[in-house]
Amino acid sequence: MAIEIEIPPEWKKFRYRGKTLEELLNMPMDEFIGLLPARQRRSLKRGLTMAQVKLLAKIRKVRQKKLTGKKAIIKTHVRDMIILPEMIGLTIAVYNGKEFIPVRIVPEMIGHYLGEFSPTTKRVQHGEPGLKATRSSMFISLK
């Protein structure tokens, strides 16, 4: 199944396990699965969940209609979907538990999970120590 994608010049040099992007797009799914790392290969060989199948259907629908702008952004909660070559060039908004984080899919992301690009936690930024902030602050004199 050949997929029609406009390939920018900077993507022409990309190779995944020795295969060019055009070869990956024209490759049958079984052959592509063989190129993936063991964890992703096992996951795809076991089959896709209903949610993953629905996401792929949405992706194919957007590709078929060639939508652009806001309508081309696909929202999903499916963080465990492996990025496939047919997703390249799309923007997928991945839910992180609070909001949808837009993720632009580029060739370097092939074989990774969508959830890897939408962090669920923020880095903790502690405030200044004040009264009752820590045990040692009990002995700081009040001004």
Swiss-Prot record:
Which GO terms fall under molecular function for this chain's record? Answer: rRNA binding; structural constituent of ribosome
Query: TM spans, by residue?
Result: none
What are its GO cellular component terms? cytosolic small ribosomal subunit
Q: Which domain of life is it from?
A: Archaea
- InterPro entries attached to this UniProt entry: Ribosomal_uS19, Ribosomal_uS19_CS, Ribosomal_uS19_euk/arc, Ribosomal_uS19_SF
What Gene3D superfamilies is this protein classified in?
A: 30s Ribosomal Protein S19, Chain A
Keyword field: Ribonucleoprotein, Ribosomal protein, RNA-binding, rRNA-binding
The record, for Pfam families, names: Ribosomal_S19 (PF00203)
Any single GO BP term: translation
Function as written in the Swiss-Prot or TrEMBL entry: Protein S19 forms a complex with S13 that binds strongly to the 16S ribosomal RNA.
PANTHER family associated with the record:
RIBOSOMAL PROTEIN S19P FAMILY MEMBER, SMALL RIBOSOMAL SUBUNIT PROTEIN US19
* Annotated family: Belongs to the universal ribosomal protein uS19 family.
Give the protein's recorded name: Small ribosomal subunit protein uS19
Per the UniProt record, the source organism is Staphylothermus marinus (strain ATCC 43588 / DSM 3639 / JCM 9404 / F1)
Classification from the root reads: Archaea, Thermoproteota, Thermoprotei, Desulfurococcales, Desulfurococcaceae
The gene designation is rps19
